[in-house]
Amino acid sequence: MKRIIPEPYLTNSRVLRKTHNPWETKLWQYLRAGRFCNLKFKRQVQIGQYIFDFSCRGKMLLIELDGSQHSELHINQYDILKQDFASKQGYKVLRFWNNDIDKNINGVLEIIKQNI
């Protein structure tokens, strides 16, 4: 059965896929086109009302990259709701800070590998 995604969510998801930040771009170079453990990852994937940075649906894994704004209380509370929703759908959510991508991309990739 085809999923019906409301147009505002679909439009936002499309915009996010076209305009990504440098940290998403860097991680995407490792995940795209089956380069990482021969798995299929997608960017800016909509699940319910939320959009996640990366998903590997075959492994029920979601990856979120967080900048410093995610330490603000209202954004942090939103992230908790988002993660709880994904968990209830059967997904495992991994979160990394942007500086982890800059300073320790190999460590990030190892953590992802351990969780697939």
Residue ranges, per PLM feature:
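Basic, amphipathic alpha-helical patches used to engage nucleic acids or provide basic targeting signals
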Residues: L16, V45-N115
